[in-house]
């Protein structure tokens, strides 16, 4: 008597582990073969997208944060994952939209360069039978609105990973609503619980691509409110603290930079390149302070500092290296009570990280630079001395 043993096909976690090896070394051909094999073995396309490619991309972020991948390696790995999405698109063509299927525009907030999350959302929606216009990263609001007028879209899915772009996201979603198109938002910028989506008046929020597709499948988003006034969402902005910090961003970065030369002695030995990276990191701190003022939420600022402390710890730099920068900022902003409150909370968060160990790295967060670390290269291409701050301030509700 013989028996037949049925061997279950590998699970998504197994395929993610197999994909990791070629992605980590930038091997596009082998990575593509793994994706084809996963789908060919019976794993549905949505799971390949989210539980294999998406899982590997989260690991890429975690490995960079833990200082096990360099910036160039992180960029190469992300590029391979982008290629894998395209490979799957050819292996598993999306469903043909049914007659009357809705049209969803998927776009990233202007200034948002993390484009892969939005692309995953777009591909999942295509697989589920929607007409999808994927506009990619860094979409200026006027161009998005023009596209809505031309296409008659039913909804916008707006993606944002960078918290400092929340004011721009607010202006963008309000502009979409003004032309009658509801907006679903998602991404780390809107908070792990969607708190900033609700604060800024988004019509819906989703924590991930599946949840976004499920929400849209349940029925149309509610029609946007008529005559929505942005300033009504954020009455605390009347104190002008956000506007001042944003418009003074370059000056504040310079002041903190020069203050650190006296208060953080290791910086005196930095090379010109290391000093440039430090200026970029200080710009991140000021940008997150301004955004915390915009949403009036200390958690945004303390969370960023705790995460930054973990990045520094992974590179052998004490979290206390952040304290002099916060002290100089407090001196410069002594006449701004909300800013002082945020800086005090941030100081306590850094001290807590220093005494109790750095916070666990959150791979879903956007990755700032690490210029306080000698020899480190920041991932951001932002120039802290470039005058873009005034534009963001002008987009704030009056």
Where are the regions that the model predicts?
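Cofactor-cradling patches in redox/metallo enzymes
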Residues: 126, 134, 138-196
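Globin-like tetrapyrrole-binding proteins
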Residues: 231-246, 279, 304, 309-316, ...
């Amino acid at each position: 008597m013989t028996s037949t043993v049925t061997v279950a096909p590998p699970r998504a976690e197994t395929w993610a582990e197999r994909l990791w090896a070629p992605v980590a070394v930038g091997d596009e051909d082998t990575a593509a073969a793994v994706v084809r094999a996963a789908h060919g073995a019976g794993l549905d396309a949505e799971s390949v997208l989210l539980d294999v490619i998406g899982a590997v991309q989260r690991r890429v972020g975690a490995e960079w944060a833990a200082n096990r991948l360099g910036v160039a390696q992180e960029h190469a790995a992300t590029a391979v994952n982008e290629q894998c999405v395209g490979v799957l698109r050819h292996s598993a063509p999306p469903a043909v939209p049914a007659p009357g299927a809705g049209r969803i525009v998927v776009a990233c907030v202007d200034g948002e360069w993390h484009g892969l999350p939005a692309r995953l959302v777009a591909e999942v929606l295509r697989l589920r039978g929607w007409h999808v216009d994927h506009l990619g990263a860094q979409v200026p609001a006027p161009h998005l609105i023009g596209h809505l007028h031309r296409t008659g879209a039913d909804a916008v899915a707006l993606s944002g990973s960078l918290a400092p772009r929340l004011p721009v996201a607010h202006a963008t979603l309000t502009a979409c609503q003004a032309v009658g198109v509801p907006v679903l938002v998602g991404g780390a910028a809107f908070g792990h619980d969607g708190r900033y989506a609700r604060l800024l008046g988004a019509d819906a929020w989703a924590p991930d691509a599946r949840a976004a597709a499920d929400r849209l499948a349940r029925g149309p988003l509610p029609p946007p409110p008529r005559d929505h006034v942005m300033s009504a969402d954020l009455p605390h902005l009347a104190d002008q603290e956000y506007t001042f910090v944003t418009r003074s961003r370059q000056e504040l970065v310079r002041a903190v930079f020069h203050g650190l030369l006296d208060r953080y002695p290791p910086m005196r030995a930095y090379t010109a390149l290391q000093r440039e990276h430090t200026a970029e990191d200080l710009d991140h701190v000021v940008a997150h302070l301004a955004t915390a003022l915009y949403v009036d939420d200390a958690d945004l600022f303390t969370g960023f500092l705790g995460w930054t402390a973990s990045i520094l710890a992974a590179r052998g730099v004490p979290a206390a290296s952040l304290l002099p920068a916060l002290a100089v900022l407090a001196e410069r902003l002594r006449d701004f009570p909300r800013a002082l409150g945020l800086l005090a909370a941030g100081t306590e968060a850094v001290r807590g990280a220093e005494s109790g160990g750095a916070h666990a790295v959150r791979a879903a967060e956007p990755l700032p630079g690490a210029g306080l670390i000698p020899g480190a290269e920041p991932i951001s291409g932002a120039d802290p001395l470039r005058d873009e701050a005034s534009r963001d301030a002008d987009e704030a509700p009056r």
